[in-house]
């Protein structure tokens, strides 16, 4: 009898041990699968193809399915690092430096995204309310809080790869209602209703893809792309400006009233440059919008200027320059001065020839709050410029353009773009 009891005890212990091992194995596979899927979602959703942006809507689901805060952080890191994978190479190109400089900045930039999503993962809620953390409304509310933080400064300064950008693909023309529907969809993807939400969002996605058309140009507007590499904005010679003026005059036509040139096209904006361009446009019934830099004692402003035969003025001052490479706030804090100045919530919309436009320069096209800020003022068109010579070998410019297209489609606005590569 003692032998039988001992045998049964050993059998029970072995069965329990085998059960724990099986669970551990399943958990490891689940964690690995979640991280691999987050990497795939980041790669596909942010490939630079506008119609693939809704893939990013799967990220909240993967975050919500994470079994621990650590895994939620790993899932967030996999998504964000893959979505922003062009940054290390871009930084290396910009500074003509070692790839490791870009790698360190890439990892540092991901820290905010990972920290926010890991912090809002609802571990306590799951412990207090078994089953309801994943099935109720705790996770949706917490995810929306994380999404809002990543959409607005200060975390929103590096809030790239925001799934909300997919709104324009899912609900083109629906404006703020479409944005609200996408927000609700993101929340539902973290709840027990995620299969129904995924089916509904998938239906809108396929419908949009089947009826997709590119945004139109504003009447009488034209964007001119350039391929001048890193010389654009650095070559201030008379010949350079004359060549650009010739390019503008060649692009002008009977139906063209406004021509848009890329970011930094005019280099340093001075009275001499302004007079040169006014003289060059004499007799041409056209207005030029072009990127330039304006120096002041505190640093410089990255701007859009407008110039015609009869007028020149600064049209727009960039709200959010590229952090670290352009915007270096520590220089101001230490009294050194220098770097590009950020005008966060200034000039969200500007008027030109009776048309209100939403201007976006380069980095502003990668984050959420500048375009939403602009759309509060009901602009008639979006004007997006960039100087992407440093993105060679990456998909950064394609991602910028996909984001601009998505926002233009969401709000039903025409858009004109001009990029230098």
UniProtKB/Swiss-Prot annotation:
GO terms for cellular component: plasma membrane. InterPro entries: C-N_Hydrolase (IPR003010), C-N_Hydrolase_sf (IPR036526), Conjugal_tfr_TraB_rhizob (IPR016707). The keyword Nucleus does not apply. Residues 222-421 form the CN hydrolase domain. Pfam families: CN_hydrolase. The chain crosses the membrane at residues 33-53, 103-123, 144-164, 169-189, 193-213, 287-307, 366-386, 388-408. It is a multi-pass membrane protein. Its main location: membrane. It is found in: Cell membrane. Keywords: Cell membrane, Conjugation, Membrane, Plasmid, Transmembrane, Transmembrane helix. The keyword Transmembrane helix applies. Enhances conjugal transfer of the Ti plasmid. This is Conjugal transfer protein TraB. It comes from Agrobacterium fabrum (strain C58 / ATCC 33970). The gene is traB.
């Amino acid at each position: 009898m003692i032998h039988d009891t001992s045998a049964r005890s050993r059998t029970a212990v072995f069965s329990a041990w085998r059960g724990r091992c099986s669970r551990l194995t399943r958990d490891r596979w689940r964690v690995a699968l979640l991280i691999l899927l987050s990497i795939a979602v980041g790669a596909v959703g942010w490939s630079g193809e506008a119609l693939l942006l809704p893939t990013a809507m799967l990220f909240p689901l993967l975050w919500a399915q994470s079994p621990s805060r650590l895994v939620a952080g790993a899932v967030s890191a996999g998504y964000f690092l893959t979505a922003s994978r062009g940054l290390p190479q871009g930084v290396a190109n910009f500074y003509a430096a070692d790839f490791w400089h870009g790698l360190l900045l890439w990892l540092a930039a991901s820290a905010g995204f990972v920290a926010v999503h890991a912090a809002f993962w609802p571990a306590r809620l799951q412990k207090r309310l078994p089953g309801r953390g994943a099935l109720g409304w705790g996770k949706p509310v917490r995810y929306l809080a994380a999404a809002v933080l990543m959409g607005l400064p200060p975390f929103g300064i590096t809030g790239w790869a925001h799934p909300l950008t997919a709104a324009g693909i899912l609900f083109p023309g629906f404006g703020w209602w479409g944005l609200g529907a996408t927000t609700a969809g993101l929340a539902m993807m973290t709840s027990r209703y995620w299969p129904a939400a995924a089916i509904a969002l998938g239906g809108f996605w396929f419908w949009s893809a089947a009826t997709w058309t590119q945004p139109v140009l504003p009447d009488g507007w034209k964007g001119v792309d350039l391929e001048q590499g890193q010389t654009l904005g650095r070559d201030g010679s008379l010949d350079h400006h004359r060549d650009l003026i010739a390019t503008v005059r060649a692009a002008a036509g009977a139906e063209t009233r406004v021509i848009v040139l890329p970011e930094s096209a005019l280099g340093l904006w001075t009275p001499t440059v302004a007079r040169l361009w006014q003289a060059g446009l004499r007799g041409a019934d056209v207005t030029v919008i072009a990127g330039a830099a304006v120096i002041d004692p505190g640093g410089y402003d990255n701007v859009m200027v407008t110039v015609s035969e009869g007028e020149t003025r600064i049209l727009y001052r960039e709200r959010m320059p590229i952090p670290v490479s352009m915007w270096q706030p520590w220089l101001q804090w230490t009294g050194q001065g220098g770097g590009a100045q950020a005008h966060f919530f200034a000039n969200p919309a500007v008027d030109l020839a009776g048309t209100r436009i939403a201007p976006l320069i380069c980095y502003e096209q990668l984050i959420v709050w500048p375009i939403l800020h602009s759309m509060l003022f009901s602009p008639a068109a979006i004007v997006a410029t960039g100087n992407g010579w440093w993105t060679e070998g990456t998909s950064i410019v394609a991602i910028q353009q996909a984001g601009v297209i998505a926002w233009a489609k969401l709000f039903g606005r025409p858009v004109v773009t001009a990029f230098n590569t």
